[in-house]
Amino acid sequence: MPRRAREYPEEGELVVATVKRVHNYGAFLDLDEYPGKEGFMHISEVASTWVKNIRDYLREGQKVVAKVIRVDPKKGHIDLSLRRVTQQQRKAKLQEFKRAQKAENLLKLAAEKLGKDFEEAWREVWVPLENEWGEVYAAFEDAARNGIEVLKGYVPDEWLPVLKEIIDSYVEVPTVTIDAEFEITVPKPNGIEIIKEALIKARDRANQEKDIEVKFTYLGAPRYRIDITAPDYYKAEEVLEDIAEEILRVIKEAGGEATLLRKEKRIRKVKKRKK
């Protein structure tokens, strides 16, 4: 079970918890990411409507996403709320928890290869990476995208080769793909050649940038689709803007017309390309 680097959760933090005991007035829950820590959820924090029977909402052994509303480390008290968690927040937290589980499994594999136990791995790798990146899997993604050197200085050097091997094999790098369409016309005998040359130059120039992939697809005159894959949405938008400006300039100088038609972004995950 993945655990956080700090001893206590912070107020406002979302946590994954397992219902331990249910009473008429509230419930006690174990905090999965904080071993040995127990939180209390008053019946008034279970739902936004009046709760006649708390067991209609909570049962022993059930896993929930709760919001931490009060923390008193001196007394060891942690108060939780279920009603203050939106469906979107719940979904995002569960995804984060799954990423932490995957990071934990990968770190266990690395520790096994080095002949270390997980407590050593947790102290030497998990804690510093979480403190720097916020979550360990985000650090692994950064290493997958930019090279294992990004972890240097945060973890002992002996971990780097085995972490590189595992990250290269198992870590998926999230990418954003956006697409749009161009309507391009050049009323000249060599109009098709002018359009083709403009698209190829724009594509090749963009593809020289790291982690950028641009592809054009002919949809039938006068329409052309562009697909841009980048590490994040903002970079993809920046590339599209640069390409559009270049294409519109070249086509206009050639006496033609070009119009950019936008579409929605798509998010996908791809395996890191081997270098």
Curated annotation (Swiss-Prot):
NCBIfam families associated with the record: PRK03987.1-1, PRK03987.1-4, PRK03987.1-6
Physiological role: eIF-2 functions in the early steps of protein synthesis by forming a ternary complex with GTP and initiator tRNA.
Name of the protein this chain belongs to: Translation initiation factor 2 subunit alpha
Encoding gene (name): eif2a
Pfam families (UniProt xref): EIF_2_alpha (PF07541), S1 (PF00575)
Keywords for this protein: Initiation factor, Protein biosynthesis, RNA-binding
PROSITE patterns assigned to the protein according to its UniProt record, in alphabetical order: S1
InterPro entries from the UniProt entry: NA-bd_OB-fold (IPR012340), S1_domain (IPR003029), S1_IF2_alpha (IPR044126), TIF2_asu_arc (IPR022964), TIF2_asu_C (IPR024055), TIF2_asu_middle_sf (IPR024054), TIF_2_asu (IPR011488)
Subunit structure: Heterotrimer composed of an alpha, a beta and a gamma chain.
Family named by the database record: Belongs to the eIF-2-alpha family.
UniProt entry tagged with the keyword Coiled coil: no
SUPFAM superfamilies: eIF-2-alpha, C-terminal domain, eIF2alpha middle domain-like, Nucleic acid-binding proteins
Location of the S1 motif domain: 12-83
GO molecular function: ribosome binding; RNA binding; translation initiation factor activity
